[in-house]
Design a protein with these regions (language model features):
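Short amphipathic alpha-helix that is part of the acyltransferase structural core
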Residues: 1-52, 170-180
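Conserved beta-strand in the GNAT
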Residues: 54-66, 78, 83
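A conserved beta-turn-beta hairpin within the catalytic core of GNAT-like acetyltransferases
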Residues: 66-79, 89
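Conserved acetyl-CoA-binding loop-helix of GNAT-fold acetyltransferases
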Residues: 84, 90-105
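Conserved GNAT acetyl-CoA-binding A-motif
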Residues: 105-120
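Conserved catalytic-core motifs of GNAT/GCN5-like acyltransferases
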Residues: 116-117, 135-149
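C-terminal "cap" of GNAT-fold acetyltransferases
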Residues: 143-170
Length: 181
């Protein structure tokens, strides 16, 4: 197994391949939009760690306090994505990446790590059965089948924001979440 991983930084971001988006040989505006979005997020503690190879092998996570998700909690990391695609799958890369995230969270004194899952696996979500092998547990659910999984180091747990949990907006105001991720 190749163990040569790279964490994206503001210094190397412009030169590194973003293995998670648009698989096109031509330039695509989504690639530069993602680079700009990442550039802003890296300064907030966002982590994008990838295999140094032409492959889709990466993990992406951020402090929950700055994550663009309707989840409430203190001192957690939010795992946006863990993806190992194609021939690298089954070679220990996912394990290495999630273990890196867990070690990073513990080293930084985080309360734990959380991620989105679903009762019925969706193709765009990280595989929650894989995460459960590392101790992640369902700590909250929504009315429409989404699940919040967490690996707690201190007994605290995050939860879905009330409007995400019930898919209901109590006021006349509307909040739209949008990002370049």
């Amino acid at each position: 197994m190749n163990t040569d991983f790279t964490n994206l930084t503001t210094e190397n971001l412009s030169n590194e391949h973003l293995c998670c988006i648009i698989r096109s040989k031509k330039s695509h505006p989504g690639i530069e939009a993602k680079r700009q979005w990442l550039s802003d997020r890296l300064n907030e503690g966002h982590v994008f760690r990838k295999l140094n190879a032409k492959a889709t092998v990466f993990i992406e996570y951020a402090p929950l306090e700055t994550a663009w998700v309707p989840v409430i909690g203190d001192n957690y990391y939010y795992l946006y994505c863990l993806w190992v695609l194609g021939s690298p799958r089954g070679n220990g890369y996912g394990k290495a990446l999630i273990e890196y995230c867990i070690a990073d969270a513990k080293e930084k004194g985080r309360s734990g790590i959380c991620m989105l899952g679903a009762k019925k696996q969706k193709s765009w979500l990280s595989d929650q059965s894989f995460a459960k092998k590392f101790g992640f547990e369902v700590v909250d659910t929504t009315d429409n089948g989404y699940e919040l999984l967490a690996l707690s180091f201190d007994g605290t747990v995050p939860q879905f924001a009330p409007n995400a949990k019930n898919l209901k907006i109590e006021s006349e105001e509307l909040t739209i979440y949008y990002d370049m991720q």
